[in-house]
């Protein structure tokens, strides 16, 4: 290697080290608008704090991520966790309370029957042990994570095989 190549490598290594120190990926700070989501169907909203955002992401990844990575639904690619799909459900699942209710007792997309025996939920915690240790607050922050993601990842969240 000549001197110029070694110099370039050193400069690139330095820039990389500085960029990871100055702009760490884990320190994404969301503004209040991005952290504000619908609380209920009456139009009330809730602003999640940074700790709730982090906890929601962690719980989503550990309890829901194996089937819903990136907001998709592996068992039914036609219905994801994107806002369009959540709005289209009956009743709509586009707010914290509706998603918490769904995680407690999931219903089909048209709302006609319970699917608790085939979808992890609090109601079916005996079949799906991952759900046993989740409190109402845990469900709330998971729902918050689901609703914040479209604001962060826009079309990628729930975008399916195109992105993941």
From Swiss-Prot:
Cofactor: heme c
Gene3D superfamilies: Cytochrome c-like domain
Protein name: Photosystem II extrinsic protein V
Organism: Cyanidium caldarium (Red alga)
Name of the coding gene: psbV
Its membrane topology: Peripheral membrane protein
Cofactor annotation remark: Binds 1 heme c group covalently per subunit.
Subunit structure: PSII is composed of 1 copy each of membrane proteins PsbA, PsbB, PsbC, PsbD, PsbE, PsbF, PsbH, PsbI, PsbJ, PsbK, PsbL, PsbM, PsbT, PsbY, PsbZ, Psb30/Ycf12, at least 3 peripheral proteins of the oxygen-evolving complex and a large number of cofactors. It forms dimeric complexes. The extrinsic subunits in red algae are PsbO (OEC33), PsbQ', cytochrome c-550 and PsbU.
UniProt subcellular location: Plastid, Chloroplast thylakoid membrane
Taxonomic classification: Eukaryota, Rhodophyta, Bangiophyceae, Cyanidiales, Cyanidiaceae
Chain sites annotated for binding heme c: 64, 67-68, 119
